[in-house]
């Protein structure tokens, strides 16, 4: 019901208007992609990649799986969890990293793609951890919501300490990918540090 300490869109303006706002933003994003695609092949490839990350094979698939497993209950596996991670948050954070690499013509595109996927996984792990350890005030949203909604999380599968250990391992994997990329990646390294240690 809250995001960043303020009422969520659907709480402030109603569910119908919130859905319409989402539709409007998606359509505006596609309009921008079409316009930019006229600039050449790299822009066309970047637009296509962004569409795949957001669409039925990306973020929407992950969100749908998240809802499905919450309703299904029963025994769930690490494969189920990491499918959600990779498609829901993974694609969301993968997209800007990989798209920027495509537009820049960077030869390390696949490494950037791998980094973005790992960063999304790390972000979702820390999100699961904060849902258990944080307060409403710290998070700017309702704490403890995952358990109430029967969400499949790394806490549910591994416990708090196990989840923290896996988050640390994932951060090390992120650093490892960055070591293989030429050029200044200090911003991305700082981003990993922030995601691992964030409090909201």
Regions found by a protein language model. Give the residues of each.
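Short cytosolic juxtamembrane segments of multi-pass membrane proteins
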Residues: 199-200
